[in-house]
Regions:
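Outer membrane beta-barrel strand-and-loop segments of large Gram-negative receptors
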Residues: 1-45, 71
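A general structural-boundary detector
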Residues: 17-19, 31, 63, 102, ...
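Conserved C-terminal beta-signal and adjacent last beta-strands/turns
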Residues: 65-185
Length: 185
């Protein structure tokens, strides 16, 4: 796993991929679908994780860290109209505080929305979307561990986009001869 170390010998930050002595994760997941007639379809997914990492030869600062964290994701699709085929999708995601080596990873989350228009007998789809509406999806990890003191600030970006998909259809899988395995006998 890649992690950062501030050298005690000179003013330098060292990013290096290391194998930890020990890493263990235990988790549980629940997924709850929910539907109201044909106009609302939703799914809530909850995940809980216990995470343990240990490294006795991590430079001059061995660590043994444990953290419980949770993840929640919700997907919602609203059918605004069937003729024309118009759907609104709103998704949300949140991740509580976690660890990675000596890093502390802060809480993060995002909300995305998309408006989907299907036409041409279901062969064409026009999709307008906005990802990370509130600009909260990017984390700024930090280290406050023994002699290490680092704060990273990363920017979040809202993304707008348009996509178009057309299904040409008519694909039929070719019939193929079976593999000759007689030589393996």
């Amino acid at each position: 796993m890649q992690t950062l170390y501030q050298s005690s010998q000179r003013l330098v930050e060292i990013y290096k991929y290391l194998n930890f002595d020990y890493q263990q994760k235990f988790g549980i997941q629940a997924s709850v679908p929910f539907k109201i007639k044909n106009w609302f379809n939703s799914r809530l997914t909850l995940i809980g994780i216990w995470h343990h990492e240990k490294d006795n030869d991590f430079w001059d600062i061995p660590f043994n860290r444990k953290q419980c964290y949770g993840i929640a994701q919700m997907n919602n699709t609203f059918t605004l109209s069937t003729r024309p085929d118009l759907k609104l999708t709103v998704t949300g995601f949140v991740h509580s505080k976690a660890i990675q080596g000596i890093y502390d990873l802060p809480t993060s989350g995002n909300v995305n929305a998309a408006l989907r228009y299907g036409f041409a007998k279901g062969k064409a789809i026009l999709n307008l979307y906005c990802n990370d509406i509130f600009e909260t999806g990017q984390i700024s990890p930090r280290i406050r561990f023994q002699t290490q003191n680092v704060t990273n600030h990363y920017s979040c970006f809202r993304e707008f986009g348009v996509s178009f998909t057309y299904k040409f259809g008519g694909y039929k899988e070719k019939q193929r001869e079976g593999v000759d395995t007689s030589r393996f006998k």
